[in-house]
Amino acid sequence: MRLVIARCSVDYVGRLEAHLPSADRLLMVKADGSVSIHADDRAYKPLNWMTPPCSLVETPITDEDGEATGESLWVVENKKGEQLRITVEEIHSEQNFDLGQDPGLVKDGVEDHLQELLAEHITTLGDGYTLIRREYPTAIGPVDILCRNSDGETVAVEIKRRGGIDGVEQLTRYLELLNRDELLKPVHGVFAAQEIKPQAKTLAEDRGIKCVTLDYQALRGIESNELTLF
């Protein structure tokens, strides 16, 4: 991972155009090729970003005499031809880290079993729901359950034993990413847990995410559709 704190301006060129004027920002370049631009607010959300696969080309900026100005132009381009054009005026700090392979989120036994039970009995979320798959892979980690509602629209489900704000934020990130996929959108969100904290429920509802309280014992008591041996 490469972290650059720099004074920069940013232009997005693609389906629309957007401009960020000159300011101090964090430029984050990850090993997967993604590039994101952050300000010192907005929690985890970048001001702008480009997801992989994409390319990054850095070119020194010269004046009329061909002399280097000390500035550089970063051009980040995806396969659709959309570009982030980052004019780096001054670098305050730059560091590179090799974080290695991340083991991913490790669920406790109850959360893992809740996911298994809910996937098997997906109509717990509502009549007409059908399962697409468990652990649906994305660039930022697997979605616990991806399914369709009775209208045939995609639903991403995040499962927790105790649902807090962090879980809602995690589901929000998945929804932002999945809703860029033309084959999946619109993608709705369901935050499912045995217990949901009031602050998390308020945040979820504010973001249009449905909250569902799961009864673990009741789910365990539902007769399985799969053959089991005792």
Curated annotation (Swiss-Prot):
Its EC number is 3.1.-.-. InterPro entries: Endonuclease_NucS, NucS_C, NucS_N, NucS_N_sf, Restrct_endonuc-II-like, tRNA_endonuc-like_dom_sf. GO terms for cellular component: cytoplasm. It comes from the Bacteria. GO terms for molecular function: DNA binding; single-stranded DNA endodeoxyribonuclease activity. The keyword Cytoplasm applies. Cleaves both 3' and 5' ssDNA extremities of branched DNA structures. NCBIfam families: PRK03298.1. This is Endonuclease NucS. It comes from Corynebacterium glutamicum (strain ATCC 13032 / DSM 20300 / JCM 1318 / BCRC 11384 / CCUG 27702 / LMG 3730 / NBRC 12168 / NCIMB 10025 / NRRL B-2784 / 534).
